[in-house]
Swiss-Prot record:
Free-text function comment from the UniProt entry: F(1)F(0) ATP synthase produces ATP from ADP in the presence of a proton or sodium gradient. F-type ATPases consist of two structural domains, F(1) containing the extramembraneous catalytic core and F(0) containing the membrane proton channel, linked together by a central stalk and a peripheral stalk. During catalysis, ATP synthesis in the catalytic domain of F(1) is coupled via a rotary mechanism of the central stalk subunits to proton translocation.
Keyword Endoplasmic reticulum attributed: no
Native organism taxonomy: Bacteria, Pseudomonadati, Pseudomonadota, Alphaproteobacteria, Hyphomicrobiales
Signal sequence bounds: none
Places the protein is found: Cell inner membrane
Complexes and interactors: F-type ATPases have 2 components, F(1) - the catalytic core - and F(0) - the membrane proton channel. F(1) has five subunits: alpha(3), beta(3), gamma(1), delta(1), epsilon(1). F(0) has three main subunits: a(1), b(2) and c(10-14). The alpha and beta chains form an alternating ring which encloses part of the gamma chain. F(1) is attached to F(0) by a central stalk formed by the gamma and epsilon chains, while a peripheral stalk is formed by the delta and b chains.
Keyword vocabulary terms for this entry: ATP synthesis, Cell inner membrane, Cell membrane, CF(1), Hydrogen ion transport, Ion transport, Membrane, Transport
Protein family according to the UniProt entry: Belongs to the ATPase delta chain family.
Keyword Transferase carried by entry: no
Protein name: ATP synthase subunit delta
Listed GO MF terms: proton-transporting ATP synthase activity, rotational mechanism
GO CC aspect terms: plasma membrane; proton-transporting ATP synthase complex
InterPro entries recorded: ATP_synth_OSCP/delta_N_sf, ATPase_OSCP/d_CS, ATPase_OSCP/dsu
Organism, as annotated: Brucella abortus (strain 2308)
Length: 186
């Protein structure tokens, strides 16, 4: 499984790097990021689309036509529209989530930013997000872009992943630690 994961990661890095170079040449990194975000939203909102990109049952031609139609319908044209078609034609749609994440990372590094994935038990207000960004900027020494995900199962607190660092202040983790400590005592 680790071999498959590193294969996808390698494919994602190569495709994201290539897309970034083209976007940089066309001076359209921001619009490419925006279009990738729109496609990612479509992906997270549709089980059928996730099945299309991950299933080997669909032929390259079927994937190409479907992705082309979806991109056109969503108004994703130009560089990203063509890129999605190339990825479909090359049977690499399974790597799209990784490609999008890798592109964001490359673009953030180019802007001198670092990206942080934040998991919260509830939606963060814009004031909370700004305070978190300022705190993380103090730790990282760079501007920080945060990607917030809501997961009620952590009960409270935050889990922040920034580069190779992870800060877990979730209530779930604290309760698990307490449970372990009580087992050792009793």
């Amino acid at each position: 499984m680790a071999e498959t994961s590193s294969l996808i990661s390698g494919v994602a890095q190569r495709y994201a790097g290539s897309l970034f170079e083209h976007a940089l040449d066309a001076n359209s990194v921001a619009s490419v990021e925006k279009d990738l975000g729109r496609f990612e939203a479509l992906l997270s909102g549709s089980e059928d689309l996730r099945r299309l990109i991950s299933s080997p049952v669909f032929s390259s031609e079927d994937q190409l036509h479907a992705i082309g139609a979806i991109a056109d319908k969503a108004g994703i044209k130009g560089l990203v529209g063509n890129f999605l078609r190339v990825v479909a034609q090359n049977r690499r749609l399974f790597a799209l989530p990784g490609i999008i994440a890798a592109f964001r990372q490359i673009a953030a590094e180019h802007r001198g930013e670092i990206s942080a994935d934040v998991v919260s038990a509830h939606e963060l207000t814009s004031a909370q997000q700004n305070e978190l960004k300022a705190t993380l900027k103090g730790v990282a020494g760079k501007d920080v872009t945060i990607n917030v995900t809501v997961d009620p199962s952590i009960l409270g607190g935050l889990i922040v992943k920034m580069g190779s660092r992870q800060i877990d202040t979730s209530l779930r983790t604290k309760l698990s630690s307490l449970k372990l400590a009580l087992k050792e005592v009793g």
